[in-house]
Amino acid sequence: MATETPETIDRNALPPAGTWTFDKNHTRLEFVARHMLSKVRGRFTEFDGTVTIGERPEDSHVEVEMQTASITTDTGMRDDHLRSDDFLEVEEYPTMTFRSTELRPTGENTFQLVGDLTIKGITRQVVVDAEFNGWGPGASPDNPPLAAFSAKTEIDREDWDMTWNVAVETGGFLVSKKVQIEIETELNPVG
């Protein structure tokens, strides 16, 4: 795909129509959940993602696939538990996916992605709030152009049959049901 690139970062115009892929060196797929009173952050280190930008923004499409075994919170025992049958069951379900079904512009550089999130073979519709951060030339003339997006959503993990928890004697539960998912990505054009 031959892509014209503005000479500087353009924060207002979407990149040209076509297929763009996640730059794995400049993309983070993270999640945040509460463990009692504190927030625990984690991420997936192995993933693929494509954004197909349409001639009209609402014709665009996003697909993301994460390798569930790549989950890490940088704490081995907790990571092993997240990979177990109590949570992601990575042996049975090696991937989780998001596929957009609709894009709704909500502002000049913001939009909602409606799509199907599949975890453990269970597919549920989610709404993802996203922001276009701009596009422009790569770091050097030899580098391809890049585009950047941020996205976030909140899910109830029990909707995907991740119900493990422990009641705390003083009230409440060990792990929150709600999980925030956040993506920061730079994209490169395909071709």
Model-based region annotation:
Residues 1-191:
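Low-complexity, acidic/polar, glycine-enriched regions of mature
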